[in-house]
């Protein structure tokens, strides 16, 4: 899980990536390719 300053680049990497907001943080979750998981504080 990477910590990124901005998630625009993370979302563009894979078509299955979704940006989810939980507890004031933005998460990228990717079911088909889990190595793209990221969090933005």
UniProtKB/Swiss-Prot annotation:
- Biological-process GO terms, alphabetical: translation
Q: Name one GO molecular function term.
A: structural constituent of ribosome
**Cited SUPFAM superfamilies:** Ribosomal protein L36
GO CC, alphabetical: ribonucleoprotein complex; ribosome
Kindly give the Pfam families that the UniProt entry links to this protein: Ribosomal_L36
Show the InterPro entries listed in the entry.
Ribosomal_bL36, Ribosomal_bL36_sp, Ribosomal_L36_bact
**Keywords of the record:** Ribonucleoprotein, Ribosomal protein
Family statement drawn from the similarity comment of this UniProt entry: Belongs to the bacterial ribosomal protein bL36 family.
Extract the NCBIfam families matched here. Answer: PRK00831.1, rpmJ_bact
Q: What is this protein called?
A: Large ribosomal subunit protein bL36
The gene from which this protein is expressed is rpmJ
